[in-house]
């Protein structure tokens, strides 16, 4: 979605709201496609004395697999959108400033980038997930598996 800001660029105090859905189901993360539902983005662009500030949130329900036990689960992911918009950059190294294309901002690109950068590298069904037994593969969240714990031969004399 491209948002045209020509009606607020030169009007301090003016703002423009946006709300849209974005399909990111084609994005692959570590061999899976967790964003199977549309991402809902909503926010506001406000002109603060000539500086355009975009604030908002992008959210979706992710379909994930636990990295410890393999159990599939769903979790809502909400990503804050917060950046400044400018028609030209003075400092190329500032990642918080998004360049306008004419008087428009590409919200699809902005939301996609924010969502990709906010994705977790490790997904757990719960913080205290015990995972699977390394010997028999039993789910340790359901109870002990019955395997005898191996003693490290280097520590057996202790």
Task: Enumerate the predicted regions with their spans.
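Structured interface patches
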Residues: 1-157
């Amino acid at each position: 979605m491209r948002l045209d800001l020509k009606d607020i660029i030169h009007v301090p105090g003016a703002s423009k709201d946006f709300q849209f859905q974005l399909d990111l189901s084609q994005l692959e993360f570590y061999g899976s496609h967790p964003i199977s539902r549309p991402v809902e983005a909503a926010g506001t662009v406000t002109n603060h004395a000539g500086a355009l500030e975009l604030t908002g949130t992008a959210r979706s329900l992710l379909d994930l697999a636990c990295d410890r036990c393999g159990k599939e689960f769903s979790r809502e992911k909400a990503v804050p959108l917060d950046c400044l918009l400018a028609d030209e950059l003075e400092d190329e190294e500032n990642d918080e400033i998004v360049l306008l294309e004419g008087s428009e901002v590409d919200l699809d690109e902005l939301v996609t980038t924010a969502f990709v950068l906010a994705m977790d590298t490790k997904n757990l069904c719960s913080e205290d997930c015990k995972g699977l037994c390394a010997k028999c593969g039993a789910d340790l969240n359901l109870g002990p598996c019955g395997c005898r714990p191996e003693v490290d031969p280097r520590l057996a004399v202790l």
